[in-house]
Design a protein with these regions (language model features):
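N-terminal metal-binding scaffold of metallo-dependent hydrolase/deaminase domains
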Residues: 1-35, 44-46
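Hydrophobic faces of well-ordered beta-strands that scaffold small-molecule active sites
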Residues: 49-55, 93-94, 120-124, 162-164, ...
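Histidine/acidic residue-rich metal-binding segments in metalloenzymes
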Residues: 105, 146-212
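N-terminal carbohydrate-binding accessory modules
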Residues: 45-49, 107-108, 112-121, 125-128, ...
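Alpha-helical scaffold segments that flank or form the walls of functional sites
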Residues: 65-116, 139-163
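Acidic/histidine-rich helix-loop elements
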Residues: 58-73, 130-145, 172-181
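Active-site environment of divalent metal-dependent phosphoester hydrolases
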Residues: 56-60, 95-103, 128-130, 168-172, ...
């Protein structure tokens, strides 16, 4: 690749006229541009891949909450999303909530080269209170014991991180978006279990009360 401008994420300033050599999908050399017998792709700007740290890989976008989709429809939307990420330069995504923990199956298929897509960290199902935000595809848990069990269940299935619903949200009907839902005590045991397993957590917190 002949990069007229290269932003490598390490240098203080962009570099110009760089030759990037790739082999088996990996960059093996970056040097000042020179003539070569190998095929060269011209690129105005080359940067490291972008990260998107909050996605829901199986959810079609732009349809609101009223339309329902079949599993097959969601599967093809998922494939389209994966292609769109790669084509827009996104090479890493953090998936924060997927029904039936399907995101981990998708992650494994990407890693195995079965389908093309970005690198993925997956949270599986979110943990929410009964009837709370995300209950349709999440694990409903009330009290510290149920929350601890929910976290352990997800960790057993192989999640990369655990997603917690601290407040309501706009995409769940009948729920006040800013209302506090899981208690601090409930969230604490989820975080404890995740950390014991060497995993991080991510929390949906919409509104000041949930953030606090």
């Amino acid at each position: 690749v002949h990069a007229k401008t290269l932003i490598d994420g390490v240098s203080d300033t962009p570099k110009t006229d760089q030759l990037i050599t790739c082999e088996d999908g990996k960059i093996i050399a970056i040097e000042d541009y020179h003539e070569t017998n190998e095929p060269v792709v011209e690129a105005n700007v080359v940067t490291p891949g972008f990260f998107n740290c909050h996605v829901h890989i199986m959810e079609p976008v732009g349809f609101g909450t009223d339309k329902e989709f079949t599993f097959i429809e969601k599967t093809f939307y998922t494939q389209k999303h994966l292609e769109d990420y790669i084509n827009s330069g996104v090479t890493f995504i953090r998936v924060l909530g997927t029904e039936n923990d399907y995101d981990m199956d998708i992650r494994d298929c990407v890693d195995a080269g079965i389908v093309k897509g970005p690198h993925m960290l997956c949270a599986g199902r979110c943990i929410c209170m009964t009837g709370g935000h995300g209950w349709q595809g999440g694990i409903e848990a009330d009290g510290q014991d149920e929350c601890r069990k929910a976290a352990r269940t997800l960790l057993k299935k192989g999640v990369d991180l655990v997603k917690i619903m601290a407040t309501g949200g706009v995409m769940t009907k009948g729920v006040e978006p800013g209302s506090a839902q899981l208690t601090q005590e409930e969230m604490a045991v989820i975080i404890e279990e995740a950390h014991k397993a060497g995993r991080k957590t991510a929390t949906h917190a919409q509104g000041t009360q949930g953030i606090k």
